[in-house]
Amino acid sequence: MNKELIDNINKELENKSTQEVIEYFLTKFKNVALSSSLAAEDQVLTDIILKQDKNATIFTLDTGRLHPETYDVMDATNLKYGVKIDVFFPNSEKVQELYQTQGVNGHYESINNRKNCCNIRKIEPLKRALKDVEVWITGLRAAQSVTRVDMPLVEWDENFKVIKVNPLINWQEADVWDYIKTNKVPYNKLHDKGFPS
């Protein structure tokens, strides 16, 4: 991907609203997808995107280790918007092998185990989800982590060979919750119990 193109898109969208950023990509590109963990930020983006395009692609990764509340919010989202979020699962044989070699919670035992688990449960399904995608929309915010402070609105993701868009990059947590309350967006009840994402 041409760095100059990404820089030009960032300049063009610099002072645009989140809705305008999303509209830009939905209208200028064919294969646009939101990856949703069903966390608050992703629910905001789901609402914004589906208000613009009821047929937009939204997917999630079911690692096999999700809380029941996550399935509840997925169901509530599907019902509210009349959609079906695409769900990508890990390869069952690889998960079974992971269990046989590391046990149920082997990912807690070492960094190598954690990386292996993450690769099987998250990275491989994400690769399948992004296979034909041109633009990957995420719910990442700069305020979530020091590693995200300098993250641009639009970037090229070399690992997945896709344009990655972070429309909420400058949002604060209060902005997310204001939007959810104002627009009656379904959210994961784990947030009420102190879970950040």
Spans of features found by a protein language model:
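Nucleotide-activated chemistry modules centered on ATP-dependent adenylation/adenylyltransferase
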Residues: 1-197
